[in-house]
Amino acid sequence: MRTLAKSILLSVIFFATINVMAKGVNDNDFVSVVNGKLMLNGKPYKYVGTNMWYAAILASEGRGGNRAKLCSELDRLHSLGVDNLRILVGADGGEGLTSHVMPVLQPEPGVYNDTILQGLDYLLVQLEQRGMKAVLYLNNSWEWSGGYSAYLEWAGQGKALIPRVDGYKQYVGYVKEFVHNKVAKQLFYNHVQRIVSRSNSITGKPYSESPAIMSWQIGNEPRAFSREGLADFREYILTTARIIKGIDARHLVSTGSEGLMGCEFSLECWTDIHAAPEIDYANIHIWPATWRWIKRDEMFTNVEKACQASKEYVQRHYDAIKQYAKPIVLEEFGYHRDDFSFAPGSPTVARDKYYTFITNLMLEGDMLAGCNFWAWSGSARPAHLWWEPWDDHTGDPAQEEQGLYSVFDCDHSTLGVIAAAAERARKASQ
């Protein structure tokens, strides 16, 4: 443990020195937090964003890549006023696994698919050209991109389990060991250092100087998966944050948390983590159907119930964190299509009502600084109910039915809701 702590400290000192030497960077181009508000170019920054987990894959020149399509999707989002994208840096572990996205970035510990890394480079260049921002998450507590389970398998914990194959309870029993496993965590810390310290192969500049990055995010929905693991979970989150800040002091650091639902229902745990100085702003996610706030048979007849439960969830977290002057971003929310359809262009009356409510909640008060809907699929069209190589990547990863929460470019009423809210957010930021 002393060796690990010493290694981390030396890395922090080394990369902090590099940061001091960086020149020619306008800090106003970077998102910051001032007095409890997100700021950009000296003005409050409120936004309507989206999730586009697959963007680095699409930006690559390998399997799954299509740079012309990427640019078209970015142009469409930019035209809607959606300039904030939450993106997976890359998947970990083996390929060809059930529920697992492909291609992967890190097939073995410390071994990288350079095609995906170069895709990430290209993506950041394209975002910079459009004045767009990215939240880049580095890990995942869920199986669809490897994450916890990949690191545990590499650390000798046994074969990674998959909920759809092995059962959800069995999966939880497996991944709850991540926050306790020193070897697995060190493998992840090595990955963090490798990615955050990277220089862009196109521009030659370190990632730390890219204004396209709003935030480095520790993971997608990080969890302890047990009450007993909460203390080690907190230390894992804050250790990762310290490593990131030691390499890149310019960009924000966030957790990717769902809120108390991701902290074993402990609001105290969520508050304690987000109040720490290593974390710049707070995250929550909201999933009314998944969390059973609303019954299946009232999903489309009682949207108001989902809205009220969502407001109460936001309020609880705002009340808990406001004394620490940390803004909250609702970075995932979603709602089913009418009649539980997955088809592009099918009716979205209930979804549109819910999106309108959430964006209004963000725009008409101080509880939320921004929101990212889940998820953008744009011109992609699912070829199968479950993703198969090499179908279009959609906003629904491989563990979900394709089209489940996707927003397609033919969902005109939903796009209208998004564009109107984004325009209001733009005016609020002037």
Listing of model-derived features with the role each one plays in the protein:
Residues 1-6:
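Positively charged n-region of N-terminal signal peptides that target proteins for export
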Residues 7-16:
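Bacterial N-terminal signal peptides
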Residues 26-294, 301-327, 333-428:
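Active-site mouth of glycoside hydrolases
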Residues 20-24:
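Boundary at the C-terminal end of the N-terminal hydrophobic targeting segment
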